[in-house]
Amino acid sequence: MGQKINPLGFRLGVTQNHCSHWFAKPNNYYKLLEEDEKMRNCIYNYVRKHIKSSSNYGGIARIEIERKTDLIQIEIYTGFPALLVESRGRGIEELKADVQTVLNLGNRKLRMALTEVEEPYTEPNILAEYIALQLENRVAFRRTMKKAIELTRKTSVKGIKIQIAGRLNGAEIARVEWAREGRVPLQTIRAQINYCYYPAQTIYGVLGIKVWIFQTEE
């Protein structure tokens, strides 16, 4: 049986870049890594609490963190920045305040910026979140996969693969179903493939959603 490596880690340094940009001494490395995780969790939790509803979803593609001597810079790539800016009136300022309460900044400054993704449905995180929202609202999984693939047809995507595992449609025995359109060359290292795993909480249990998107070949 073939061993499945994470497509992002497999291409790190070739077609994939790191999401955190900083250096640290060995005895201080784990503290900064924990801080990064806290910041990302805080942002995702804020989006789920204040923005995500039955009709829309956060649409965060990725979060990049850059550290300098006394500055932490967070860049949030999102497909729908208006949702984040206009939420609850204050939006980004309230989110920044939430992150500051989680961290012990000391003399450091925190800067936060929003960057709009031109084609939201070329990002696997956004597509996986859309699929999860549909499944949680009890939409049939085949219809959901078909709709997600249709959303990518008008974009620059060359191939997409979607896999959903769990008690599909409430079946007693869990199984795995998948759909693919176009090419998804997972063993070609120079192929720019984005990948995401996202869990969906349904009344029958947790469904695991995996999305692979092939964008271009370098």
Curated annotation (Swiss-Prot):
The gene is rps3. Part of the 30S ribosomal subunit. It comes from Anthoceros angustus (Hornwort). This is Small ribosomal subunit protein uS3c. GO terms for biological process: translation. NCBIfam families: rpsC_bact (TIGR01009). Keywords: Chloroplast, Plastid, Ribonucleoprotein, Ribosomal protein, RNA-binding, rRNA-binding. GO terms for molecular function: rRNA binding; structural constituent of ribosome. Coiled coil: none annotated. One of its GO terms (cellular component) is cytosolic small ribosomal subunit. SUPFAM superfamilies: Prokaryotic type KH domain (KH-domain type II), Ribosomal protein S3 C-terminal domain. Pfam families: KH_2 (PF07650), Ribosomal_S3_C (PF00189).
